[in-house]
């Protein structure tokens, strides 16, 4: 196909006469715009080589990128590939191209477009006003000569953005890869004619890039010299914001003379530096003119303070090859070496501070070997339609290809493990299907004209559909579950409305027709936020829904230098000459400083008190050791960059082994515990081994987990509905069938969670618990209906800021907030809690109208809490240089006591040297504490505590009265049986049941008691306690006497309201539903009848509306159609009994630890004091209330003294867990450790949210970053991972769609395909928080915004219009943390300093 319209005006018909009206939508003929080769940056390996071309490539290195509309981005690409029709060598030398090197060659019947990758794209000749479309490259080439394009043409609107003289000129050509632009203007250079030249001079047989024009009419202009030795060369650029850049050029003679002068001044022998260069290279004609430096000469925003040095400078070999790149601080950041014989053929390169990578070529100029002295090396073997790649670990990969030139594609890939994947492409090289190693095929349906994906069908037959407007913008997408997102755009192609799958609508407003930056956004709640922008597109101010303003300051390079928020909070940032962040200062002047090595790796963080934390790196920038407060952790890597050994602060080691595809297959921990992993052909985990426990994992066709078996016995089962939503998880716990059922509304939002427990023998329902969720019209989850309680309604303002809480129709809690939306006053009846903050945003005080509970907080310069003062007592805290709590000094009227906390280097508790001076213990290398001052401990091979026995001091006569605690676990390492004995007699025994998510649902406790005969033995009948949950939060505790229910602050583990109901009262609330009543007496003879499920749902909804006295019009119409009234239905309902309930407010400390229970009358009904690790020190409980909540997420078990902590049990005496972290190293290096600063940090679950990064291989790196660009901005791919509830992680990120060249640097985005295991490094960014995790899982499913190559400081901030991977992950995390912040002061402070507010 030629890519020309099927019927063009002027074409002749078979029987004569021309066509008057053409069709722009259908293309005819042989393909046009086909490239001579595949894209150099497409398929790459190593550092990097394109094996399809056999070429050494560097797909993109950015030297200049200042923010603004149509910014001047100077980036370099290199390819050793040589096209047969090259353009002349550009100003960066042979093999190198920059965007301005685009050139169009005009030949008799062919147009040859030379792109900035060194390729040639071949188009047919174009008539004036005609266009050619390259389907393989998604690129339009249009010849001027008409005022308008056909109305149906995709480029019609973009064409009208051009000045009329450009549109009407038949001598100009224009190219674009998107209907949104920009246009690349291909014209000619105006020149001064020679004296004897005949005028008018003919136009040259080529066109060069003269500028860019976007859809708003903004321009970027390339200024070319009209006369002299640099005639036709670019010597200046004016970007879209009005900045002027001067490009300093040199000739070979000038460079030779400069080299001779440097040799003379340096007293050295001048090297051979010829005055001229050969006029032709393998890369095209060469005039010897090179770019020496780029200066910023005019800056409209900073006219008086221009940089005194060039933004970038280049060094050259005597043969005119690019040898070095220097950044704006004059630091050399890149160096290159070339073949002695073939000019421009790169044989080595390096980033400053990184090893040199070398390359060897065969006689045809193809790379045969890539040599890496500090990592993997590769060899390449070329055969017809087959390339074999072998690395230095002897792993072989074979690529099978079809097609030639620009249509060559990899159709089959043989992996190192022998597995094979295959791909199918259409006639123009677009992906149509992929078959994985298991033989399963995913099909892709691209649009015939645009190539945009319109449908994806997965191997299980489920499909996703995508729809676009005439300008190739996504207008709607429907997932396999039927949920849909929709987008609307204005006439300029700007997003004006987006509808999420749950129906939430976000609107965008614009006040400037020449800008794509919104002036306001409006979310689903109707809350409006406004923004103002600089001429460079930088956010200057952000006004939230309440009218509160945040202001931003920037430097000339686009970096944020200050953020000013309400309430006087400001943050200041400083940068060095390379643009690296070197200092952050808060409002109080507390400054944190940063230091870097030559490669740009962060080596030192200096805290405000001067303490230093350092990191050392290997040759590739991977951290090999970190030192904090004199304690060091180290990491070792193999040649493939995989971690193979960790060395803890104690000198103990964890080792790792991998398969040939870099998947982890064995991990041996610090204590010798070994775990092994096996994967199927597609990479899914199918078998894991853990010291005798063998788990098999089973999946359905959609790769959803269906069940697991452990040692041959079924563990959990997962069930899904037809939409793919999880509906049930079940397993057997201590013989009981335990199931969790999930219900959803029509928008896919969780509506209910129903837990059931059945008897092992009779299948009798022993326990059930349901939590329901409801959403308001704006999509906020503002209602929760706890089991057997009235609805809990959260009252909000703006975009969801909490202002109050109601239980049923009764308001209970009210909140007052400041201009930063921080809580300043909480009211509960007569109870009032006033909260104040320091100028730096830290918690300063919490004062009650009951003075005895007042608290004041004092912080040091490092942000550590050093004192809590109250009328009862004062506690002062001391820390080690690693931030660990080392001591507490408590003073009161009759008390003055110091308690030290001593740990080994890895954080394991040691005996206090003052109290136990004779102790020889200095560390626990395996992190298993075997003894302390009170007990002896034993562990099994899984590292689980199995026995704890009283320690009998030496010299004490043994009487065999020591107490022994024994712990027994199931195959999932959950405590299921506990006993405590003395004199070989049981004192207490307990057994525990769990649901398939690992949440405890019941415990049975037998205690020693005297029977009727006077004999002491365990009770025959256990005391049974049942538990109910809302996600990861324990909300219900019920025994035979009472039910206690807890309502937590939204998104946190901090309890807010306690509701206690006598069990006898609960029995009175039992009633039939309306549906049950009608079914029991609805038969023709008065007997029972079974209603269809749809009718039951309608009756349930009607009943809930009647009970709430809010019957909808829809329900009234339905009843009327049946000849019924609301009153009639109400008369059929069983009466509702409201039980007597005791309601108390939890008064908690800054961590969420309950300190008091406040009655509705404002009196203190219960009060307690704890030590820093959650041990109860004192309790005032006149009403005998049961208050078992301890540190967030913890429940006290009286029988064992342990605190149940969701995934495991916490021993408050040791300040650590009794089993290892179920997520292993993902939760930290010490698997037993609770946060070592418990007064500031909490761990409600023992899991966490991770921020992961990995290299952009296209940027040439293999470590956690690929090296800085010349102004110091690190480029790496960043994404987030959260626990998936199945013992693993699910990840999400932002990626450039990259389906065609038309996607561009600011093209459509897509969800990245990431895994936790593939990361170069993952860092903990949020301790366990189910609200954050669930919020992020929702973010992972959302359609991505448009991709931006620049970070947020260059493009819209926190608006989601343009995002690179780093900004998307940062903003998603901060948004979810904000939604889930509740009253967590520490988290709020972090928000303030990360720009969320």
Curated annotation (Swiss-Prot):
Disordered: annotated span: 1292-1312
Assigned keywords, A-Z: Repeat
Region of interest called 28 X approximate tandem repeats, as start-end residue ranges on this chain: 330-1186
Keyword Repeat attributed: yes
KW Repeat (keyword) present: yes
Disulfide-bonded cysteines: none
Repeat region (Sequence), residues: 330-352, 353-374, 375-417, 418-438, 439-460, 461-481, 482-502, 503-525, 526-546, 547-567, 568-588, 589-609, 610-629, 630-650, 651-671, 672-691, 692-711, 712-734, 735-758, 808-828, 829-850, 851-871, 872-894, 895-930, 931-959, 960-984, 985-1019, 1162-1186
InterPro entries the record matches: DUF6531 (IPR045351), RHS (IPR001826), Rhs_assc_core (IPR022385), RHS_domain (IPR053422), RHS_repeat (IPR031325), T6SS_VgrG/RHS (IPR050708), YD (IPR006530)
Domain of life: Bacteria
Coiled coil: none
Domain note: Each rhs appears to consist of a highly conserved 141 kDa amino fragment followed by a highly divergent C-terminus.
Chain's role: Rhs elements have a nonessential function. They may play an important role in the natural ecology of the cell.
Protein family: Belongs to the RHS family.
Protein name according to UniProt: Protein RhsC
Provenance organism: Escherichia coli (strain K12)
Gene this chain is encoded by: rhsC
